[in-house]
Structures are given as structure tokens and as C-alpha cells.
Amino acid sequence: MKLRKIMAGIVATSVAGTMAVAASAQYDAFIMYASGSWYPSTMDASGHSEDAASGTVTEWTAGTAEVTKDGTYTVSVSGIKASAVDEETGEEIMAPTPGEGAAVFNVDIPDLSTALGIGANCEGYDATMTAAQKMEFAKSKGINVTDVKITQVTDGETTEVAVDSSKIFFGDIEGNGKFRIELYNQFGETKNDAPLNVADIYFNESLNVTFTISGIDAITGGNIKPADTTAPADTTAPADTTAPTTG
């Protein structure tokens, strides 16, 4: 079967079957991944994306983990498919799509940095700090990430991707309240001294990351609360736009 990427239209029936997948919730860790060519890209936990320019639909299964306590967690991305055209029949289908290399490869945990007091708007945090400094700030509060392990599955065979944990950055790297474990980001500081060889990444079934995080329980007492992500109320008095009296 010969395939080509679909450049227009949407495989409606397949999309309908995946729209029930929920977007990432507070503290649900997920893999943010884009291949070396940016195709495919699975940048959140929704399991569905559509390229506005080309109309290409991408679907995947996001294996998430709720991170609210110290512990070891595993997250994954699997079953990646993208809209394509069978060149023999002209039929629009969802075709299995492997991931090769990486432009972006992170684990993101929404709102966790805010909840732990190690992110933007927290005392001592400075958005101008480097990724290394943001990580040291998180460590100064007792947070640490260790024992990072990356595995991938291709044609039923599991292999491990070597990773140097000493080169990983973690914390509120982007200043948005998320807790990020940055494994590789061509726009980030890991590009300069990568923790892994992106050429080692190739999978057609799943990509998996296991990590251990500590320090949460000491900060929260084992009872993490929902992070406040609401914008502060505008307390500025409205301008007086009434015309002055002349009588």
C-alpha cells in the first residue's frame, strides 16, 4: 500500500472516535513530543491535533500519570496515526506513523510548579533565569527528579534510549506554572549539551519515560491542593467618561 500525507480534508469518522479524549488535567504528567521533522507531533495529552495549514490530522494515545506525591511515574505516547491518502485507491485513511528523532521531547505536568511554590509569581523565581538556575531554584525548595529512564517499542521489541540525567533540566522552565522535565528541546538549553542522542529515537508503537520525583510531600504535607490558575481581579476603578456640567 502506497501512502502520502493528506494535504486537505479530515478523516471525519476517525476524528469522531477520538474527540472524547480529555485534555491534560491539573498535575497529569504527559509526554510532549515532536519528531525531528516535526511530523508527527504530539504536543499535549488530548490525543488529537489538526494542522491548520495542511489539514493533516494526527491522533495518538497519551499515557498520563497524576503526580501529586513523591514517587516513581511512567508516561507514554503510543499508537500515533496521521491522515493520509492511499495512492492506489484514493481513500483517506489514518495511517500508523513512526516517530524518528526529536525536535522536542519533554515531560510536562500542568500547574505543579505553581502548586509547589517553585514557579512564576512565586517569591524568588525570576523569569530571566536560565533553565539551570530555574532547576536550582526548584532544588532549593527540596524538589528533585532522578532515575529517568526512556524506552521505546518498535515491532514488539523494547529498547532503551540512553540518557544522561545530569544534563536534564526540570522546574518551571517556561515560566507558565508547569513543571517540565526537559529531555531535549531544540529551542531550549538542552540543545547545547543534550542529555540523549536524538538519533537513537525510533518507534512505531510507543515512547515511554519513567522518572522519580521527590520533595512534593515535604512541601504539601501529602495533601496537594488545586493550583489557583485564575487571573487576579482587576481592581482599577473605571474612568469617569461623563461630560462635565457647565451649569
What are these regions, as identified by a protein language model?
Residues 24-227:
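Beta-rich carbohydrate-recognition modules and glycan-binding surfaces
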